[in-house]
Structure formats: C-alpha cells, structure tokens
Amino acid sequence: MLQEIIEGLAAALFPNRLGLPDLKEEGIDYFVGHTLDVALRELVSQVKLELSFTADTQSQLDASKLDASQAANLTTQSPIEIVREFAKNLPKVRLLLDTDIKSAYEGDPAARSVDEVLVCYPGTQAIIHYRIAHVLHELGLPLIARMITELAHSATGIDIHPGAVIGESFFIDHGTGVVIGETAIIGKHVRIYQAVTLGAKRFPTDEHGNPLKGNARHPIVEDDVVIYAGATILGRITIGRGSAIGGNVWLTRSVPAGSNITQAQMLATPLDVSAHQANSSHTNSANSTKQLSKEVPIAH
C-alpha cells in the first residue's frame, strides 16, 4: 500500500515524467488532482493504523516515562487533519526536489538531462522517498516515515533515516551503501558518493544499559561539502563549510571550514610513528646481532 501511495505522490509531483505516458497538457490538472485524491485517501488509512498502534503502545507505557522524542511522536490530531497538513507541504517538497535534481545534473558529467536524473538515478529515488517521509516524520508519524525510507533502502541500497535534516540541492552519486543516521544534519549543496556513512560513534545509556533514544549522535555537515566514496564520519562532529572528505577516510573529529581531508593525512602520524618504531627496532636488532657476533664465536 505505501509503495502505491509513494508512486502516486511522485506521479503527482512530476506528472510529465512519472505520470501517465500519454498524458496531454490539457489533462495534467485533472490527472494531478485525481492522483493526489487517491494517494491521500489511502494515506489517511495508513495514518489511522499508525495512530491506533501508537495508542495501543501508549496504553502499555507510563506516559511519564516517555522520553522527549517519543512524546513528540504522540499526536492528538485526527488522521484527516494530519494528511491535510502533509498535503500543504507538497509544493515545498517539489521545490526541494527540483534543487536536488538540478544539483545532480550539474554535478555529474555523465548526466545528459534532468529527465535522466529524475527517472534513472537511484539517489533521486531515495531522496524523493526521504523528502516525503521527512514531512510525515515531522508530523508525528515515525512508523510510516521509516517504512517509506526503507522501501527506498531496499530498492537502491541507500539508507536515509527520515528524521535526518537535509538542506536543498542534495546529491547522492551512485549511492549504494550510503547510510545517513537519524540525527544527522546536512546543509545546502552537499554531495556524497557511494558507501558513505554518517553514523553514531557512541550513544549514552540509562542505568540499565539501554541506549537513550533521540540524542544527537550523528554528524553535522555544513554547506558545500563533498564526501567521497567509502568515507565514514561518526559522532556529533561538524564538517565545516566547503570541506572535502576523501575516499575511505575514517573521521571522528570536527574539521574547520575549507578542510581537505584525505586518508593519507589521517594515517600520516600513526604510520610515521609505526615506521619509526619499526626502523628503530630493526636497527637495534641488527646492532645487537653484530655485537653478539663479536662477543660470542659462532659455532660451525
């Protein structure tokens, strides 16, 4: 059901490319209106299910023990009111997606057209799912939101938590293996490549050793940052504006604006120390052998 809803919403957002193949200009308004009506009605039924599930869960818990993130997800709005509020956000979603697609087209020399980016790129598919899911997440529907992003995860290999905050003009190139955690914050005009992880380094626990929910534990990536393939960035650290993070870098500390971080830089100090220690050990061993050969005759 959710897959059909997402397909309907995407078709309504981009009727000329994701709508009917024989759609005429004079029929666009009707198509968009009808498609939205069907998708939103089906979404109402899904919202009812989540709210029912939430109510059942709440009845089993002491409300005073809910943490801030759980409490924020409890809503008193009716399903129709929530979906109506969601629908009001769709024009904004379309505008954001336009910037994402434009960024991909301008940032990838292999892209022949914006249409190719829209219909072919897995990163675009994942971002469409994320943009829709994020609105639902903000409206207090974390289950539906997570299910939507997991549909994209299954289809593209790109795992974006709907709670992440991502600015305009976001481009994921290739995409397979990308992971963006729940509390990650990504600025404008950010480009990331395949197998990048924006994850948590550690998280606080309660007195029973259970992880606390909702704590900020993922990176903040400022505007105009590029993160190349295989980079792993962990913890609540900040990647300064205009920085470039090289391939396969393991990063657990903040870097200032304009930084250019490479794997060689990250490994330079440990490698130099290790090399020095190895050379020293080899030299000492050789000297010891020479000294020993002078002091003790070698048996033949």
Outline where the language-model segments fall.
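Core catalytic architecture of nucleotide-activated donor-dependent transferases building glycoconjugates
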Residues: 146, 150-154
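Terminal amphipathic alpha-helical/low-complexity segments used for targeting or macromolecular assembly
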Residues: 1-147, 277-300
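Structural signal for interior beta-strand "rungs" in well-ordered beta-sheet cores
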Residues: 153-273
